[in-house]
Amino acid sequence: MKKSVLTAFITVVCATSSVMAADDNAITDGSVTFNGKVIAPACTLVAATKDSVVTLPDVSATKLQTNGQVSGVQIDVPIELKDCDTTVTKNATFTFNGTADTTQITAFANQASSDAATNVALQMYMNDGTTAITPDTETGNILLQDGDQTLTFKVDYIATGKATSGNVNAVTNFHINYY
């Protein structure tokens, strides 16, 4: 009986020691690593400009009779930037992505889905109104200014042949390249 009591006592002591040892080995410390980055963006795009709609005026098909003829009704396409910091970068270019017309490859194809005008595309220009912006091609250099500014591009109808009446629609997604 003494052996049984001694064996039971040793078993209890060992079990208690194991539990105590397990508690002593519990992981109670750790670490968390935080990573981040403070940036100095060149400019911030004004939200209202990000997804804008430009409505062109109606134009007579008689103004678009031959390939390459423009209507002469250029409309401003403003893109507003704010908080520009020229200590970060002084220059930008834009890339206007979209479907190029197959005849006038520097113009955006008419993508109207119903009652579409034929032989008409949309030509974008730099602010000077003469330098064409080709789809998916970087524009020329634009000098940035400190603070807020509006960069103005232009758009006009351009004939790809003898135009017929109907709807004209094109979409371009743009990317600003700072350098």
From Swiss-Prot:
Top-level taxon of the source organism: Bacteria
Keywords, in A-Z order: Fimbrium, Signal
Coiled coil spans: none
Signal peptide: 1-21
SUPFAM superfamilies reported for this sequence: Bacterial adhesins
One GO cellular component term: pilus
Note: The operon is cryptic under classical laboratory conditions, but is functional when constitutively expressed.
Keyword Signal attributed: yes
Main location (coarse class): other
Localization, UniProt: Fimbrium
Signal recorded as keyword: yes
GO biological process: cell adhesion involved in single-species biofilm formation
Induction record: Expression is negatively regulated by H-NS and subjected to cAMP receptor protein (CRP)-mediated catabolite repression.
Protein name: Fimbrial subunit ElfA
Species assigned in the record: Escherichia coli (strain K12)
Primary role: Part of the elfADCG-ycbUVF fimbrial operon, which promotes adhesion of bacteria to different abiotic surfaces. ElfA is the major fimbrial subunit produced by this operon.
